Amino acid sequence: MSLSTEKKAAIVAEFGRDAKDTGSSEVQIALLTAQINHLQAHFSTHKKDHHGRRGLLRMVSRRRKLLDYLKRTDLAKYSEIIARLGLRR
């Protein structure tokens, strides 16, 4: 249920400031979005996986908090990442 190492590396390369930038808010938001999208596909077939759904809600909450932080600190990066990820905030 987790992302592969190659997929994570591609996301870090696309959204990070350099190849080893894994801690910036932009990268964390992009990784959480990829994981959330992966889990949404899982829940379309496994409707009664309530334990996994709880983890999904936790990830969504964490992403929302990171997006709020980014909006508060750097509005331009917030707008850019919303557009690049296709989020509807």
From Swiss-Prot:
GO terms for cellular component: cytosolic small ribosomal subunit. InterPro entries: Ribosomal_uS15 (IPR000589), Ribosomal_uS15_bac-type (IPR005290), uS15_NS1_RNA-bd_sf (IPR009068). GO terms for molecular function: rRNA binding; structural constituent of ribosome. PROSITE patterns: RIBOSOMAL_S15. GO terms for biological process: translation. Transmembrane segments: none annotated. It comes from the Bacteria. CDD domains: Ribosomal_S15p_S13e. SMART domains: Ribosomal_S15. Keywords: Ribonucleoprotein, Ribosomal protein, RNA-binding, rRNA-binding. Part of the 30S ribosomal subunit. Forms a bridge to the 50S subunit in the 70S ribosome, contacting the 23S rRNA. Belongs to the universal ribosomal protein uS15 family. One of the primary rRNA binding proteins, it binds directly to 16S rRNA where it helps nucleate assembly of the platform of the 30S subunit by binding and bridging several RNA helices of the 16S rRNA. This is Small ribosomal subunit protein uS15. It comes from Histophilus somni (strain 2336). The gene is rpsO.
